[in-house]
């Protein structure tokens, strides 16, 4: 993506050189352009985007009408998840929320699976790294790891990173959705994400709400889940971001703390 001077900035650039077709890393220079001031800029395949700002490069966002097959018969039969919709897995400690999410990530009918480990135990993430490279996707015949993105911010990592991890997963999902792919974002867990929001709010000395959570917590959560959805792109293709997250009940979260 060509560099800009700010939001909404448009100015003329001249392509100076382009590398031939082939295989390159995202950090390799693939082109050099010259701006209106005569300065050269190296262009790579790295794209930068603020994670809290939604990617809205689509023409239309219709109402979800198809089912996202999770591969778990009980969910698909009694409580189906819409493609481009949101769903959650509630339960107390030890109920198997993370195990169920791992089962869905292995069998779900999606092109890209994004797993966000937000405040979870590190050993649960290590299991994914051990299992997924060995398992084969029955739809494509490739390894499951080839379609899986893992964002690891476990409980021993900084609070700021834990807060940003969920936004990062959604932004990556929107990036692949703009390519016309079917994306499933799985966050584990949003309860610990809310705890991170509370800690950051307290450190910034913001006005506290109920149980010391941010006053605008409901708006933050609703704006985040509003970024999911089925979209029609400008080229006529359709893409989707479906969100599934685990949730621990409030009083159990406080007891755990």
Over which residues does each language-model region extend?
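Conserved P-loop NTPase nucleotide-binding/switch module
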Residues: 96-99, 104, 108-111, 122-123, ...
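Flexible beta-alpha connector loops of hexameric P-loop NTPases
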Residues: 64-65, 114-118, 148-164, 203-219
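Single conserved hydrophobic/aromatic residue that forms the stacking wall/gate
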Residues: 2-7, 11, 247-250, 254-257
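Conserved P-loop
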Residues: 105-145
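Short beta-strand segments of a lipoyl-like beta-sandwich/carrier module
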Residues: 9-25
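The Walker A (P-loop) glycine that initiates the GxxxxGKT/S ATP-binding motif of P-loop NTPases
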Residues: 91
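P-loop NTPase nucleotide-binding/switch module
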Residues: 9, 28, 32-85, 101-103, ...
């Amino acid at each position: 993506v060509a560099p800009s001077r700010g939001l909404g900035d448009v100015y003329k650039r001249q392509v100076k050189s382009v590398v031939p077709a082939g295989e390159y890393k995202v950090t390799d220079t693939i082109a050099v352009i010259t701006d209106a001031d005569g300065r050269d800029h190296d262009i790579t395949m790295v794209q930068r985007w603020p994670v809290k700002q939604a990617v809205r490069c689509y023409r239309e966002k219709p109402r979800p009408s198809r089912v996202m097959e999770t591969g778990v018969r009980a969910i698909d039969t009694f409580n189906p998840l819409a493609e481009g919709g949101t769903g959650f897995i509630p339960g107390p400690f030890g109920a198997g929320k993370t195990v169920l999410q791992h089962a869905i990530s292995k069998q779900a009918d999606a092109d890209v699976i994004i797993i966000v480990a937000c405040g979870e135990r590190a050993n649960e993430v290590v299991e994914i790294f051990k299992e997924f490279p060995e398992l084969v996707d029955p739809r494509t015949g490739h390894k499951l790891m080839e379609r899986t993105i893992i964002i690891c911010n476990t409980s021993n990592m900084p609070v700021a990173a834990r807060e940003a991890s969920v936004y990062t997963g959604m932004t990556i999902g929107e990036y692949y959705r703009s390519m016309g792919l079917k994306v499933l974002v799985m966050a584990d867990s949003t309860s610990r994400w809310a705890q991170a929001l509370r800690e950051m709010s307290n450190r910034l000395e913001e006005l506290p709400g109920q149980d010391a959570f941010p006053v605008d917590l409901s708006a933050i959560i609703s704006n985040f889940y509003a970024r999911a959805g089925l979209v029609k792109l400008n080229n006529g293709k359709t893409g989707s971001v479906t969100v599934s997250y685990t949730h621990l009940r409030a009083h159990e979260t406080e007891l755990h703390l």
